[in-house]
Amino acid sequence: MEELNIDFDVFKKRIELLYSKYNEFEGSPNSLLFVLGSSNAENPYQKTTILHNWLLSYEFPATLIALVPGKVIIITSSAKAKHLQKAIDLFKDPESKITLELWQRNNKEPELNKKLFDDVIALINSAGKTVGIPEKDSYQGKFMTEWNPVWEAAVKENEFNVIDISLGLSKVWEVKDVNEQAFLSVSSKGSDKFMDLLSNEMVRAVDEELKITNAKLSDKIENKIDDVKFLKQLSPDLSALCPPNYKFNFDLLDWTYSPIIQSGKKFDLRVSARSTNDQLYGNGCILASCGIRYNNYCSNITRTFLIDPSEEMANNYDFLLTLQKEIVTNILKPGRTPKEVYESVIEYIEKTKPELVPNFTKNIGSLIGLEFRDSNFILNVKNDYRKIQRGDCFNISFGFNNLKDSQSANNYALQLADTVQIPLDETEPPRFLTNYTKAKSQISFYFNNEEEDNNKKKSSPATKVPSKPDRNSKILRTKLRGEARGGAEDAQKEQIRKENQKKLHEKLEKNGLLRFSAADANGPDSEPRQYFKKYESYVRDSQLPTNIRDLRIHVDWKSQTIILPIYGRPVPFHINSYKNGSKNEEGEYTYLRLNFNSPGSSGGISKKVEELPYEESADNQFVRSITLRSKDGDRMSETFKQIADLKKEATKREQERKALADVVQQDKLIENKTGRTKRLDQIFVRPNPDTKRVPSTVFIHENGIRFQSPLRTDSRIDILFSNIKNLIFQSCKGELIVVIHIHLKNPILMGKKKIQDVQFYREASDMSVDETGGGRRGQSRFRRYGDEDELEQEQEERRKRAALDKEFKYFADAIAEASNGLLTVENTFRDLGFQGVPNRSAVFCMPTTDCLVQLIEPPFLVINLEEVEICILERVQFGLKNFDMVFVYKDFNKPVTHINTVPIESLDFLKQWLTDMDIPYTVSTINLNWATIMKSLQDDPYQFFLDGGWNFLATGSDDEASDESEEEVSEYEASEDDVSDESAFSEDEEGSEVDDDISGDESEDYTGDESEEGEDWDELEKKAARADRGANFRD
């Protein structure tokens, strides 16, 4: 059992403090009662949870604590009681006023638990009728299910006067001791570090005009708490602030709340604010808030970043800084009430800038510690019943909202928040625990001047149309069979696209150097990140199988162990230590050689292997191999086969474990028990958890959706809103089904299968389709209706499809609405789609607002465009009718995505679409070896970008190099072999189309002197096709 690091001296000191103070609580309770059910990660600031953290530094679920005169009773499980056993001796001291009793409950004996509950209620009743509890606490779980009926009955029977003790508890843990102040310093330093990361990401997004929402930028920062490499970089600064005898542990770092980023024209300065799904607005001001907690002690920091501010905004920000200094230095004094503090702040504003008084926040912060916002100690005009004391720690948070800039007429807001400690020493002034820069020069950024200068420099060349591409464009248009486009307007668009791509490539290279450093290298010279996974066959001798007494080789499948008889004793070898073996027969003996993992065997362990097969140490001794012989050949053969099968099974199990390593256990779905649950009936799901395909139902609940199969109650799929990355609706227009597609952030398990996409669909039409082309003649025997009936049938089908689209679109919108802003519905744009082969078969790919998708034929394709680093268009060369697309992701560990065999007619459109989506692309005439490219990129990404990044490809795609290659191609003269090859390729597909093209549209395009240019490619192809057909007839 893992040993918990509980400081029992602190536990005794604090529980005695609580015992000595509770008689002074409002309402004079005779006893205190704290009941904690299951842990609630959604609300970690309930009073009982805070009490556990204050006393033990841990939360003990399913535990009851009662304080009655002379004793403290704790009812908990036997496993948790073992951790608290040491505390009992501390309370046996004769000077101690109370004793501690541990009562152990048992989940399997509800009658015993009820007796314990009755006994503790009897003690409470004997203490008096007034019982103090935290009334607003609300817990769930089996423990609460057992306790609540007993307590409710006892309250009625004994006529208990139950009172709320939240205010009294707030006063008990208000003053922070030295250790608590140290924990607050650690958490505050963590907030500084994450604010620095947030500001860098925010400034980069504004500077590069990235299309990112406030919420997505917030999620990006929030996910950094799971980045072990980043946390290790913070460790030296944070560990120096820890209390003596407390070792820093970055696993104790967590978010107080999700980072809040606000931009645009609407701002919320309350602590309950959330990041919106609006685009990050890089003008005016951006408010950013971070809160980190360490060992459950909270901190908070808020900064205002000014983007191209006017003089009025800058002056008001200067006043904000002055006001903060005034509050902390001169107003926040021990002995004053929050009402006096707030009124003093208002007086100062009225004296200095009276026009800002209506815009000032209704409070200037609150007490902070184990509770992020103590509602019983808010610094506002209503709080006249508390007084500031030495040792208090405050989140000083205030600002001005709904300000209007006279220059731009835009709304803006200013806000500052810092964690401030009032020291225990009277000679020391209040101390800022959060120290991230707030100086105006450091938080102000100016971009407009630079952009205006750049626009002036680039305005003249941007409108200039070069003459050289104009000549080549005609040739290119003919060879690729695209639509006829010409003139200066098309050439100008092409030039603009090239310039935009050039900027995107420059930005890509610049970002690469910013994202990576030399420390990110993971090449052959870097230190391998390898580890050893411990294993154990048996803990005690009694666990060995009973049949080992025959001193034969045994294979214990249950313990994954080979048991060998050595010197008359069974010696276990875990299958993980076994490498390979061999079996040979020599004379009457059969020899079995077993080789084990050991240092130095087979040239050592490759650096590519992450998991070491053994733990190398100077103290360890290894067995390299063991050879056994026996006259019982059949027995040895059977044993060798069992060992081989056990090794295969262990290897397979380990591969499955690694494959499912990225599967995240979702939180529990909270069912909607109030109001009407929205549902969508008669739908099918892909993939299907059942073997049979039957219509089912999907429900919308409080924090997610649930697909429920009618076949079995346990056959269902729960998807939380927080795990949905993309919610996509695809109409049945042009398709046989209507679809709501859900692409997940983290895969979930369906049985033993890992899935990242879940799709709900319904077939759009159940009508039979006549594919014979015979009309009524083909089925006159069965169909007697005329054209009017057929027309009415078609109209009815259109109505059904429209109603189906409306029903599914309404349900998709309902999912987005229930997510409280986490999700938005994306629609597919069929008009922008194109054919391609992302897997094995040709499908129709379509873009949405943020993705490129294929949702009709499994396996589905969902490419998030914001995750794409670059797109490479491969096999783009003269004479080929299709090309390939390769998407490289910003996460270089993620495999690239191929979409093959895209028609060449889509090339120009896709180039423009990629440019519009701010995705740089390059063009290659060949298929590249992506395994080699990505391997070099992963080994040392910093050196990759230092050497020019993606410039090793055809940078800018449509650059001058491609133009020159086109000129060379235009002088190509076809040989007989080449012509016959091309005609053979196109004969079946284009035979009749070539004639139509030459006699129709193509002839109208060429109004110049064709005698100088000679026959074009289509004409040569046509002749070759006729020649081949003639040769076939002769044959």
Swiss-Prot record:
InterPro entries: Creatin/AminoP/Spt16_N (IPR029149), Creatinase/aminopeptidase-like (IPR036005), FACT-SPT16_Nlobe (IPR029148), Fact-SPT16_PH (IPR056595), FACT_SPT16_C (IPR048969), FACT_SPT16_M (IPR013953), Pept_M24 (IPR000994), PH-like_dom_sf (IPR011993)
Function: Component of the FACT complex, a general chromatin factor that acts to reorganize nucleosomes. The FACT complex is involved in multiple processes that require DNA as a template such as mRNA elongation, DNA replication and DNA repair. During transcription elongation the FACT complex acts as a histone chaperone that both destabilizes and restores nucleosomal structure.
Biased amino acid composition, Acidic residues: 957-1019
Result of altering P565S: In spt16-4; induces a spt phenotype characterized by depletion of many mRNAs
Outcome, altering P920L: In spt16-6; induces a spt phenotype characterized by depletion of many mRNAs
Domain of life assignment: Eukaryota
Gene Ontology, cellular component aspect: chromatin; FACT complex
Protein keywords: Activator, Chromosome, Coiled coil, DNA damage, DNA repair, DNA replication, Nucleus, Phosphoprotein, Repressor, Transcription, Transcription regulation
Region (Disordered): 448-496, 768-796, 956-1035
Keyword rRNA-binding: no
Pfam families: FACT-Spt16_Nlob (PF14826), Peptidase_M24 (PF00557), PH_SPT16 (PF24824), Rttp106-like_middle (PF08512), SPT16 (PF08644), SPT16_C (PF21091)
Biased composition range(s): Basic and acidic residues: 480-496, 1020-1035
Subunit: Forms a stable heterodimer with POB3. The SPT16-POB3 dimer weakly associates with multiple molecules of NHP6 (NHP6A or NHP6B) to form the FACT (yFACT or SNP) complex. The FACT complex interacts with the CK2 (casein kinase II) complex subunits CKA1, CKA2, CKB1 and CKB2 and the components of the transcription machinery CHD1, CTR9, PAF1 and CDC73. The FACT complex interacts with the PAF1 complex. Interacts with POL1. Interacts with SAS3. Interacts with YTA7.
PANTHER family found in the cross-reference section: CDC68 RELATED (PTHR13980), FACT COMPLEX SUBUNIT SPT16 (PTHR13980:SF15)
Protein name: FACT complex subunit SPT16
